[in-house]
């Protein structure tokens, strides 16, 4: 008898995330950068999944900024990403008060109170995944390396906190002047 596995697929502006559930438990997850080649990356991710679970049956739902068109073409259910996040958090971490989600090009805050309230940044991508990637590149590391660098900091430098472009123009001269990473 084939096992029914449930796939959640988030096709974002910079990455593809996939989670596979069996009987409500996560049995597989993956986070892959698509480097603006969404279709080929999606095919690669799904092909590797089919190789890993060749005898199983799947249900699938899509979310994310890059998923709506794909869901229409493939006739696969699409769930708006704030709703997907809200549903997962309410089920898996029901005592949560606030969720902060940093996407590749946006940032969202979801407040869980009597009513769900959601806010999203405007047109600026400062503080998003793309901004963090740019800062990591500027510092010759990756986003995990930013975590490690932050653990050993000795000085806090004044950097614009409201705009990614201004932050970058604050960081570059500091590095040129020999500021420690």
Segments and roles (model prediction):
Residues 3-40, 44-47, 122:
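Short glycine-rich, Thr/Ser-proximal phosphate-binding strand/loop in the N-terminal lobe
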Residues 4-10, 59-61, 95-100:
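Short glycine-aspartate micro-motif
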Residues 10-14, 65, 102-106, 128:
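A short acidic Gly-Thr/Ser loop motif
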Residues 22, 31-34, 52-83, 110-119:
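Short beta-strand-loop/turn "lid" adjacent to the catalytic site in phosphate-handling enzymes
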Residues 81-100:
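Active-site cofactor/substrate anionic-group-binding motifs, chiefly glycine-
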Residues 114-155, 163:
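Glycine-rich phosphate-binding loop plus the immediately following alpha-helix
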Residues 167-181:
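Adenine-nucleotide phosphate-binding core of ATP-dependent small-molecule kinases
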């Amino acid at each position: 008898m084939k096992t029914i596995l449930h796939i959640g697929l988030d096709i974002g502006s910079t990455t593809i995330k996939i989670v596979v559930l069996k009987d409500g438990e996560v049995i597989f997850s993956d986070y892959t950068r698509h480097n603006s080649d969404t279709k080929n990356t999606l095919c690669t991710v799904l092909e590797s999944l089919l190789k890993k679970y060749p005898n199983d049956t799947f249900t699938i739902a899509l979310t994310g900024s890059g998923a709506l068109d794909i869901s229409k073409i493939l006739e696969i259910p699409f769930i708006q990403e704030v709703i997907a996040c809200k549903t997962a958090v309410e089920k898996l971490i029901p005592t949560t008060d606030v969720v902060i989600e940093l996407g590749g090009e946006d940032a969202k805050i979801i407040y869980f109170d009597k009513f769900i309230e959601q806010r999203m940044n405007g047109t600026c991508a400062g503080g998003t995944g793309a901004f963090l990637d740019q800062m990591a590149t500027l510092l010759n590391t990756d986003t995990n390396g930013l975590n490690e660098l932050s653990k050993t900091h000795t000085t806090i430098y004044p950097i614009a906190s409201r705009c990614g472009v201004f932050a970058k123009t604050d960081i570059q001269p500091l590095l040129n002047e020999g500021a420690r990473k």
